[in-house]
């Protein structure tokens, strides 16, 4: 059982929801990424999604695009992202880390070389936005062979065939994109999410995390009533953008604690 799978199993036993924050490696500066990851854990993160910056992040809204631009300007590369995870692991061996990004940097490195390096850095999962499950069985197999969970996206427009494809090649959890659009979008249709999640869970058989459009503790709590996990990214990036460096970690921790407290008010298992 992977670290991600055991995390969800432990949370399910206690009826808690996973809190999965996202930040971009190298934003606002490479030397601040590990302190920010530690701040996320202090704020109640169960799993960390660490963005690999890319020059054309097609699924991301303006906030995360700006974070990628800053990280790239700071010289962040896929290899440096792996070095960052390795540094994080010197102080935290428990919290699962999922790399989230796009295919181009991985293909430039080479899939086999990437999964080997990710395993050595103690990465736990990888979510490649532009790898459709029906076209990347070899990548998913290589990831699993290296002990990494290949994680895939589902959306309101996903077909039952896409559900079956994800169930066949994915592991760890499902990232359900709750909106048609890009990250950071403002309006969530809670009723649509509540209707869709049980269908996904029944057909795919994995925990379901919901992201896109979660802006505050209240929206996180409402999503937590139906989902196994809440993924929140753009709002954290905004906190990073507005915070002075000497308050950066403290502000991120404080915001995440509000979300964690709200999630912990949700009672009972969603299964």
Swiss-Prot record:
Active site: 49 (proton acceptor), 60 (proton acceptor)
PROSITE patterns in alphabetical order: TRP_SYNTHASE_ALPHA
InterPro entries: Aldolase_TIM (IPR013785), RibuloseP-bd_barrel (IPR011060), Trp_synthase_alpha_AS (IPR018204), Trp_synthase_suA (IPR002028)
EC number: 4.2.1.20
Catalytic activity from the UniProt record: (1S,2R)-1-C-(indol-3-yl)glycerol 3-phosphate + L-serine = D-glyceraldehyde 3-phosphate + L-tryptophan + H2O
Entry superkingdom: Bacteria
GO molecular function: tryptophan synthase activity
A Pfam family this chain is assigned to: Trp_syntA
Pathway(s) served: Amino-acid biosynthesis; L-tryptophan biosynthesis; L-tryptophan from chorismate: step 5/5
Assigned GO CC terms: cytosol
SUPFAM superfamilies documented for this protein: Ribulose-phoshate binding barrel
Sequence similarity: Belongs to the TrpA family.
Xref: PANTHER family: TRYPTOPHAN SYNTHASE ALPHA CHAIN, CHLOROPLASTIC, TRYPTOPHAN SYNTHASE, ALPHA CHAIN
Role played: The alpha subunit is responsible for the aldol cleavage of indoleglycerol phosphate to indole and glyceraldehyde 3-phosphate.
Subunit comment: Tetramer of two alpha and two beta chains.
Name of the protein in its database record: Tryptophan synthase alpha chain
Protein species of origin: Aromatoleum aromaticum (strain DSM 19018 / LMG 30748 / EbN1) (Azoarcus sp. (strain EbN1))
Lineage of origin: Bacteria, Pseudomonadati, Pseudomonadota, Betaproteobacteria, Rhodocyclales
């Amino acid at each position: 059982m992977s670290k991600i799978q055991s995390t969800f199993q432990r949370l399910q036993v206690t009826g808690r929801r996973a809190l999965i924050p996202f930040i971009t490696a190298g934003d606002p500066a490479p030397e601040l990424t590990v302190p920010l990851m530690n701040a996320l854990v202090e704020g109640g993160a169960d799993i960390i999604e660490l963005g690999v910056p890319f020059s054309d992040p097609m699924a991301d809204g303006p906030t995360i695009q700006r974070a990628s631009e800053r990280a790239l300007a700071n010289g962040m590369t896929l290899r440096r992202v792996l070095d960052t995870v390795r540094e994080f692991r010197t102080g935290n061996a428990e919290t699962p880390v999922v790399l989230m990004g796009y295919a181009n940097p991985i293909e430039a490195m080479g899939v086999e070389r990437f999964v080997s390096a990710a395993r050595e850095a103690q990465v736990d999962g990888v979510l490649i936005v532009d790898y459709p499950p029906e076209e990347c069985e070899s990548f998913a197999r290589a990831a699993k062979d290296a002990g990494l969970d290949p994680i895939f996206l589902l959306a309101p427009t996903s077909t039952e065939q896409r559900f079956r494809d994800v169930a066949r090649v994915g592991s760890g959890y499902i990232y359900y994109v709750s909106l048609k659009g890009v990250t950071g979008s403002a309006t969530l249709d809670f009723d649509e999410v509540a209707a869709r999640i049980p269908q996904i869970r029944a057909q795919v058989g994995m925990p379901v995390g919901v992201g896109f459009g979660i802006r505050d503790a209240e929206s996180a709590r409402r999503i937590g009533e139906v989902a196994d996990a809440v993924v929140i990214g753009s709002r954290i990036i905004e906190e990073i953008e507005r915070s002075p460096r000497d308050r950066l970690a403290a502000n991120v921790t404080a915001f995440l604690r509000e979300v964690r407290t709200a999630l912990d008010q949700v009672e009972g298992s969603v299964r």
